[in-house]
Amino acid sequence: MANIGKRLSAARETFDRDTLYTIDDAVAHVKSNAKAKFDETIELAINLGVDPRHADQMVRGVCNLPNGTGRSVRVAVFAKGPKAEEATKAGADVVGAEDLMEQIQGGNINFDKVIATPDMMPLVGRLGKVLGPRGMMPNPKVGTVTMGVTKAVNDSKGGAVEFRVEKAGIIHAGVGKASFTEAALAENVRALVDAIVKAKPSGAKGLYVRRIALSSTMGPGVKIDTSAAVSA
């Protein structure tokens, strides 16, 4: 822990913590300070001027990062018949119906994302208490309840990131790995910021995007100039 503290302190000395940086400069600082012995995730935190306790101020959506997430995502699909075959051909890791429900109820959740065809939702709905807290419950708003199984599987494995505002009005999401090039990370950051701006709810009043910060798993946060990022 002492070494982590020293490394964090040293990283903070490489940039001005009060300066608002462009996305490109923020990425450069964060990437240069990602020196852990593993490939750190680069994370974006956005403070929004919303109160998610009100339904008309909820912010939720999905963004297909142009350069992917750098993660290997295992996908489970609830489907039957031709759609189950389609899911398998698309590369889904687990495909099933009642058998998949029993697997999940038994605690065997060896996947990261769940997709379902609409006709499977009465079955999937019985798993709400298990999948909901894990953020894995299929939802048509983010494209995981769909007849377009192939696209949903490809998006999930190819870089789709779901975002949802937390109680404090903050969205946290990974935008890649420290091993990505600066250009790839910056492009991913811009794509996610743009998606969140487009997801502005009707009930949002006043300043919508209040603060943006970028960090690596073990590194300090670097502040981003919101006015430049939102208009970029």
UniProtKB/Swiss-Prot annotation:
Gene Ontology biological process terms in this record: regulation of translation; translation
Gene Ontology annotations for the cellular component aspect, listed alphabetically: cytosolic large ribosomal subunit
Gene Ontology molecular function: rRNA binding; structural constituent of ribosome; tRNA binding
Keywords: Repressor, Ribonucleoprotein, Ribosomal protein, RNA-binding, rRNA-binding, Translation regulation, tRNA-binding
Pfam families noted in UniProt: Ribosomal_L1 (PF00687)
InterPro entries: Ribosom_uL1_bac-type, Ribosomal_uL1, Ribosomal_uL1-like, Ribosomal_uL1/biogenesis, Ribosomal_uL1_3-a/b-sand, Ribosomal_uL1_CS
NCBIfam families in alphabetical order: rplA_bact
Family in the record: Belongs to the universal ribosomal protein uL1 family.
Assembly notes: Part of the 50S ribosomal subunit.
Functional summary from the UniProt entry: Binds directly to 23S rRNA. The L1 stalk is quite mobile in the ribosome, and is involved in E site tRNA release.
Protein name: Large ribosomal subunit protein uL1
